[in-house]
């Protein structure tokens, strides 16, 4: 059970790091004299979140085989897509959702015996 809590935490940290990177990219579009500070803050936040995720990932790999853990981490596709829709108003096509459903089905197949 601890392994799955770690995996969820890694997924959430990675997703949050991706959102911070998106925000940094948007901050870079601000006028030149306003963009440096917010861009650096968002980039620093991304580095911290992604670094924490990586450290927990290393811990997780002590408990789960890579061949099991890595495919399950693909749940990030769902998290990032939902977060992008919620925070940035991005739209996903039905083909996009079909691809995500295929990924989730694959995750189910891999984790069925765990």
From Swiss-Prot:
This is Probable 4-amino-4-deoxy-L-arabinose-phosphoundecaprenol flippase subunit ArnE. One of its GO terms (biological process) is lipopolysaccharide biosynthetic process. It is a multi-pass membrane protein. One of its GO terms (molecular function) is carbohydrate derivative transmembrane transporter activity. PANTHER family: 4-AMINO-4-DEOXY-L-ARABINOSE-PHOSPHOUNDECAPRENOL FLIPPASE SUBUNIT ARNE-RELATED, SMR FAMILY PROTON-DEPENDENT DRUG EFFLUX TRANSPORTER SUGE. Pathway: Bacterial outer membrane biogenesis; lipopolysaccharide biosynthesis. Residues 43-112 form the EamA domain. Belongs to the ArnE family.
């Amino acid at each position: 059970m601890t392994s799955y809590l770690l995996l969820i935490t890694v997924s959430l940290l990675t997703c949050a790091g991706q959102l911070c990177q998106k925000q940094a990219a948007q901050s870079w579009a601000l006028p030149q004299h306003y963009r440096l500070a917010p861009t650096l803050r968002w980039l620093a936040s991304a580095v911290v979140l992604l670094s924490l995720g990586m450290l927990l990932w290393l811990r997780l790999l002590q408990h789960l085989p890579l061949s099991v853990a890595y495919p399950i981490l693909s749940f990030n596709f769902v998290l990032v897509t939902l977060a992008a829709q919620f925070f940035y108003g991005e739209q996903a096509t039905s083909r996009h959702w079909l691809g995500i459903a295929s990924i989730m089905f694959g995750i189910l197949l891999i984790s069925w015996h765990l």
